[in-house]
C-alpha cells in the first residue's frame, strides 16, 4: 500500500460524551471549533496541533467542514497557477501535483490505489474487503495511481483558469458526503464508518463561495454525477457498503472530473 504522510494522532475515547455545561451556546461553539480542527488535521498536512480526546460522533460532525479543507488545499495550488511562475507549463504542473499530494498527505491517493486493487479484483466481496487491508500494492492499484497522476499533471498544465484547482478541491469534499451518507459502512470499525451521517447542508454552505466562481455549479453537477456512478459500482463490488479508502477514491475522481471540465472547455453557460 502506498504509504501516506503520518496521520494526525487522534485517540477515540468510547466513554460517554460529557454533559453540556450551563452555557449551551458556548459549549456548541467549542464542539464546532473542534470539528473544524479535526477536519483540517485529518484531511491536510497543515501544521496544526494534534486533536485530543476525540469522542464518538466527532468525525461525523467534522465531515461538514471537509469543504474548508478543500479551500486550504485547492487554494494553495490555485495560488501557484495564479502567480504565473516563469517556468515551462510541464514543470509548473509537476510542482502543482507535488503540492497537491503534499498538502493532503497522499491520503486520498492512498485510498485510490487501495480501492483499485480491491474493486478490480475478480474476487468475492468479502475477499475484496480483505484486499483493502493488504499493505501491498498490486498491478491494478499501480496502474490506476499512475494514470491518475498523469491526468492530474496533464490537466494542471493545460492552461486551466487559475481558480479551477480551488473549485475541484472544494467540490470534491462536498459531493463525497452524498455516498458517505447514502451507503452503509463496509467496515464498522473504520474511521470511514465514523465519518458517515455528516451534515450535507452545512457542507454546501461552506462550499457556496467556490460554487459562485465561473461555471463552478455546472462542474459540481458533473462531479456529483460521476461520484454517484462510481459509488454505486463500488458498493456492488464490496457487498453493498463503502469504506474510507473508497471515499478517498471518490474525492480523487471528483477532483479530476472538475479539472477535466475546465480543461476540456465545457463551459457553455
Curated annotation (Swiss-Prot):
Predominant cellular place of this UniProt entry's protein: membrane
Metabolic or biological pathway, per its Swiss-Prot or TrEMBL entry: Cofactor biosynthesis; adenosylcobalamin biosynthesis; adenosylcobalamin from cob(II)yrinate a,c-diamide: step 7/7
Protein keywords: Cell membrane, Cobalamin biosynthesis, Magnesium, Membrane, Transferase, Transmembrane, Transmembrane helix
InterPro entries: CobS
Cofactor(s) essential for the protein: Mg(2+)
A GO cellular-component term linked to this record: plasma membrane
EC number, as in UniProt: 2.7.8.26
GO annotation terms (biological process): cobalamin biosynthetic process
Top EC class, one word: transferase
Catalytic activity entry: alpha-ribazole + adenosylcob(III)inamide-GDP = adenosylcob(III)alamin + GMP + H(+); alpha-ribazole 5'-phosphate + adenosylcob(III)inamide-GDP = adenosylcob(III)alamin 5'-phosphate + GMP + H(+)
Subcellular location: Cell membrane
Bilayer-crossing regions: 63-83, 87-107, 137-157, 158-178, 202-222, 246-266
Membrane topology classification: Multi-pass membrane protein
Record GO terms (molecular function): adenosylcobinamide-GDP ribazoletransferase activity; cobalamin 5'-phosphate synthase activity
Signal sequence range: none
Protein family according to the UniProt entry: Belongs to the CobS family.
Protein role: Joins adenosylcobinamide-GDP and alpha-ribazole to generate adenosylcobalamin (Ado-cobalamin). Also synthesizes adenosylcobalamin 5'-phosphate from adenosylcobinamide-GDP and alpha-ribazole 5'-phosphate.
Protein name stated in the entry: Adenosylcobinamide-GDP ribazoletransferase
Organism, as annotated: Deinococcus radiodurans (strain ATCC 13939 / DSM 20539 / JCM 16871 / CCUG 27074 / LMG 4051 / NBRC 15346 / NCIMB 9279 / VKM B-1422 / R1)
